[in-house]
From Swiss-Prot:
It comes from Burkholderia mallei (strain ATCC 23344). The lineage of its organism: Bacteria, Pseudomonadati, Pseudomonadota, Betaproteobacteria, Burkholderiales. Belongs to the Maf family. YhdE subfamily. This is dTTP/UTP pyrophosphatase. Nucleoside triphosphate pyrophosphatase that hydrolyzes dTTP and UTP. May have a dual role in cell division arrest and in preventing the incorporation of modified nucleotides into cellular nucleic acids. One of its GO terms (cellular component) is cytoplasm.
């Protein structure tokens, strides 16, 4: 046995306001504390695309930037040391990045672009360990096939309000499931937190669960 075993941590800081990610951590049995941005933090600014940026690079870069911002938040607030977990999800088709829709028209345009086609859902994961070191980030890639859908059906979905705040303007675990013909990859990754990769990273960061 090593003389000095690494300490384990009974919880992780989750730097996300997504209810879906909280539910998925609950599914793993991971205890967490929310590490939300302060009102004066411009978290959305971190999601700005760079010119010509590839989707893989984009989602990993944004995820790491959010993790670093969360770690700085932890230190500034004088919180107890523990690992920080951040995830970021984007939808991509034809090399384009489909983030969160700006309004109903934007949501409808995104959904119309996805209808009858296959797109990729990328979710990046970043963990900063309790000492402040960034661990190698992970990337989950899944392919989602949408069935052809009439514009009226898509418009009705937009009217539910579900597309807002979601990459690609849909939630696979919600009413958008009626459009999903098949998936190839991680269902939890499409929801926003791939559990296989999450469990591996948290165990490597000595989170007990």
């Amino acid at each position: 046995m090593p003389e000095h075993a690494a300490p384990s941590y009974p919880f992780v800081y989750l730097a996300s306001q997504s209810p879906r990610r909280r539910e998925l951590l609950d599914q793993l049995g991971v205890r967490y504390e929310l590490l939300a941005p302060a009102p004066d933090e411009d978290a959305e600014a971190l999601e700005a695309e760079l010119p010509g940026e590839a989707p893989d690079h984009y989602v990993l870069r944004v995820c790491v930037a959010k993790a670093q911002a969360a770690r700085a938040r932890l230190v500034a607030r004088g919180l107890p040391a523990a690992p920080v977990l951040v995830a970021d999800t984007t939808v991509t088709i034809d090399g384009a990045i489909l983030g969160k829709p700006a309004d109903a028209a934007d949501a409808l345009a995104m959904l119309a672009r996805l209808a009858g086609r296959t797109h990729d859902v990328l979710t990046a994961l970043a963990v900063i360990d309790a000492t402040g070191e960034l661990m190698p980030p992970a990337l989950s890639r899944s392919a989602v096939r949408f069935a052809p859908a009439a514009r009226e059906a898509l418009a009705r979905y937009v009217e539910t309000g579900e597309p807002f705040g979601k990459a690609g303007a849909y939630a696979i675990q919600g009413r958008a499931a009626e459009f999903v013909e098949r998936i190839d990859g991680s269902h939890s990754g499409i929801m926003g937190l791939p559990l296989f990769e999450t469990a591996a990273l948290l165990r490597a960061a000595h989170v007990a669960f």
